[in-house]
Amino acid sequence: MTLRPCLLALALSLPPLPLLAADAPAKYRSAQEIIDAAPASDWHTPAAENTLYMDLEGGRVIIELAPQFAPEHASNIRTMAREHFWDGLSIYRSQDNFVVQFGDADADDAAKAKSMGSAKPHLPAEFQRPLQGLAFTALPDRDGWAPRTGFVGDFPVGSDGKNAWLAHCYGALGAGRNNDEDSSVGAELYVVTGQSPRQLDRNITLVGRVLKGMELLSTIKRGPDPMGFYEDPAQRTPIKAITLASELPEAQRVKLQVLRTDSKTFADAVEARRNRVDGFYKRAAGHIDLCNIPLPVRIR
């Protein structure tokens, strides 16, 4: 006599067992939890020759240049930083929900304008560049301003499959110009401090982004309507200095690291934001906008 047929019949008659723990859905981790667990290899230090320290009375703003998108402007900005062009100048514009702008407030007055030293007085417009040759990490979601969006290095980028361009996200650094598209030289710069004005993409040369210190710029007192330029020079925010990190001894450089946008950690953090299902969120969006993805930065 054998028990096998009886055991088989009994097994078939029982309700299915719950999924094994290994098959259960993974517990949701927030983007911050994912970032906190990132291995050291997922972080990198921006190149010192592309890092600017903007020192204000209230603290330091750290900026990263993007020479892969605007090489001529980045080179000119480096020249002006080495020659201390911005030292003693000011933030002379703060427009609500738009930008702060800084440089020489008297630049249009030849009698008062500060010399740009050995910087080039004319540069080509650098609105976009070929996508080929860039390591483009694409996002899965549709965008109203570009057929494709994603990241190249530390920068949010739009693309049409042929060309790529930097996006006007919060913290983007752009080179102010007049009506002529090639009228920017990098002496007058602005930082986006409001909702992302993506209509400016491919209309102005973007040269980098703020990595740290946005709170020092976004809280500057707004200038008068309609454009935010201060009428009273006393209302401007003085710039103590803008310095290239590469001009300082290594011991004096800020030990800043940025999460690699081509890392699994970054991809997982983006997905956690796209489909947030924690105790507060009742419906996952299943979508994320390019400019709603913060770039994780840390000081070591």
What is each residue range found by the language model?
Residues 1-5:
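Positively charged n-region of N-terminal signal peptides that target proteins for export
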Residues 6-16:
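Bacterial N-terminal signal peptides
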Residues 19-300:
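Cyclophilin-like peptidyl-prolyl cis-trans isomerases
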